[in-house]
Amino acid sequence: MGSTKPRTSAQASAPKVQSLPEKTFIIDNGAYTLKAGYAPGFPPPEDLGQALSACSTIPNAIAKTRGNRIYIGAQLNSQVTDWNEMVFRRPVEKGYIVNWEAQKEIWDNAFFDEKTVRSKDLRIESPEDTTLVLTEAPNALPTLQKNADEIVMEEWGFGGYVRFVGPVLNAWNEVQSLFGDPIGQDSSSPISPKQCLLVVDSGYSHTTVTPVYKGQPIQRAIRRLDIGGKHLTNYLKEMVSMRQYNMVDETYIMNEVKEAVCFVSNNFAGDLEQTWQGNRKRGLTDAAEGITVDYVLPDPNTGKKGFMRPHDPLSNAKKRKSILSGGNAEALSEDVLILGNERFTVPEILFTPSDIGMKQAGIPDIILQSLSVLPTGLHPSFLANVLVVGGNTLIPGFLERLESELRQIASAECVVRVRRPHDPIRSTWLGASRLAANRAELRKFAITRQEYQEYGSSWAGRKFSGIL
């Protein structure tokens, strides 16, 4: 009987793992918009405007007009003129992709179909030669994560892939200057994450609090408030529909109204007292008039967009007088919303969810809940580095109110600093682009197509969660 020769080490070793494709495409897959584009090379641009120029914002929706015309994704930015009674179908619900059929249609339209891609900078010509960085909301269900991984790697066949918890990527941004800390990192050295960062992400579907330590989320400390921009818009629709015009079917228009007029009050009880209608009988109208504004609704017949203007309490009387005298036809055709306490009671639910009957704590309290599960020694570092991102943080007064309330409930010895990046909507994408510039760091998190085919989606899920 012949003896079997032992296998050499070269024969026993696994096949050489492929390196990641050089091109890296980033999709911050938000519920309201996609933030997408190719990551720049190393070193990334120091100028913020130049760095963000590679990122495009695309509506993450399929919409149908009252004339039954369909618009997909980027078409909503360029082709729609009449937003009245527009019906939206969104693939993301409560922060997670739950309808991949619709999401695939939007991605195909925005990135893959040569006929519909609006810019060559957004075209993914060869997925097999591209690494995809895809964001997800914290604490996604494993089934939803597996669906995403299988579609990305099996449907499109990307050469490299990594799925990140979105808020975490903000740790790779240059946030030291926001907090007034010295920038100790040389522009030519590899980019590394900030050591301690508490990210408050208030977007379309929800608000999350994510403590990030050395580039990794502390999972047990992540907290979520089920209120986002969608809920603010719906609340405003209800209030206006009860008090003035029926705007229940005008989601887009009321979202525009919300962005134009709402603010977070630093003296809620005082502002509410000022705008109380009973004050008119007592002659206390001056302060209320400073809060109350008019919003002229858009006119699809003339193409005129909606806009805010100071409230004129005599406008109705002037309008009646103009009708009698045959006055300006354009002014007579205006539909105007008069907005007083609606301006600040709507965003107030981010801080006091009980106002609408929700049994959840507001943003300042869930930040303290998040820190309560961490070692006490870390509390000062996180409270001194609170970064707010997401569209809701652009509401005037949000930053000041959050910092004020945190100071009131935090330990007296802790310094509280709350900062917002220059562009809180695209900040997560920017962080991903800076991480992608550090190829060695990206390789720690990402997988290649060869690895996915060899080990499968379950292994990929463990890799992305940091278990491997």
From Swiss-Prot:
UniProt key word Repressor: no
One of the record's GO cellular component terms: cytoskeleton
Coarse class of the protein's main subcellular location: cytoplasm
Keywords, alphabetical: Activator, Chromatin regulator, Cytoplasm, Cytoskeleton, Nucleus, Transcription, Transcription regulation
Molecular function GO terms recorded: nucleosome binding
Subcellular location: Cytoplasm; Cytoplasm, Cytoskeleton; Nucleus
InterPro entries registered for this protein in UniProt: Actin, ATPase_NBD
Pfam families: Actin (PF00022)
Family: Belongs to the actin family. ARP6 subfamily.
Subunit-level organization: Component of the SWR1 chromatin remodeling complex.
UniProt protein name: Actin-like protein arp6
Natural source organism: Aspergillus fumigatus (strain ATCC MYA-4609 / CBS 101355 / FGSC A1100 / Af293)
Lineage, broadest ranks: Eukaryota, Fungi, Dikarya, Ascomycota, Pezizomycotina
